[in-house]
Amino acid sequence: SNAFLEKFLAIGNFSMAVSSYFIGFTIDRYNKKKLMLFFSSICAICIFGEVVISNEIVMYVVSVIYGIGAAGLITIVPPILMTYKTEENRNFIVYNRAINIISLTIGALLAGLLTGKQFSISIKNVLLIVPILYIVSIIVFTLHDNIASKSREKSKERNFYLKKLVSERYWILIIVAFLCLGFAPLLVNFINVYFYNRYNIDVSNIAYMYALINFCSGITIFFVSKMEFKSIKCIMSMVVLIILDNIILVVWNNLYIQVCCVFAYICLFELLTSYVYDIVLSKTNSNFHGRISGVIQASCNLSETLGIYIGGVMLGLKCYWLFFGVSIISTVVSIISIIILMKEKDD
């Protein structure tokens, strides 16, 4: 039922948000490769459990456990990617995000195709593919031995970074920045609803249009990831483009322009979030990447959940100026926090 699905998803989201913070500390203490395998295994088992279990109470428990596993994977990936970072390959976090968008789009299209009239495969049987993919990723990951598990040095330098990292000002800046940055891209979770409410387009056509926009966004981000956009000027340029994009979405009703603006909206926010994430990790000691990543993920998850509820209300009332205005304000507040943080770390 819809009531069960809402509770199931809400419990999973809350589990992800809360566990991300504590998982971050675990990542800094233990071998990243083993933790990656552990979290992947949890997700595979939980997806299989969702297919075979029918009891609602047990499903809620599965949702909590899956939330922990998913939070672990999301939180651990950026610190792991930072271990591969070289002068030639600088933007792994952006590159990873591009691959995620492309694979999610392809996965959604395949799921829709397999459960459609042509193949008529049940949703539960399609879901069984997911644990298999997790197992394949575990095997591939196990064969790759180049992940460096950074040793924690008990030195004056480490103590200095510890003091700086746990300072109240530093944490507040990160939390404010990513709470706002997680909340800002309100439209991303409502693109289907937005086009349906504003233009009354057929649902199936919206689905294909959304898939095309997402796929093109992923390809664009993939190629842009080869470039370097981490100076304050570049970050500010992205923010200006986001503000202009939001304004055009409010005032210009032409459908083709709207589609182009939504494409730009996704690209800009994904690039901005990924680059800012990379900047924060690059400017801090690698011994603390796990806990920083945990705080970032917890902040983004909580604010995104809040954005889903608030954004849904505003779209339901068709308050587009308020919807995009809130997005602009949230983006600006986030970037102000990031600029202050960047200057503080440089000092």
Predicted regions and their residues:
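Structural signature of the two symmetry-related core transmembrane helices
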Residues: K34-F48, K233-I248
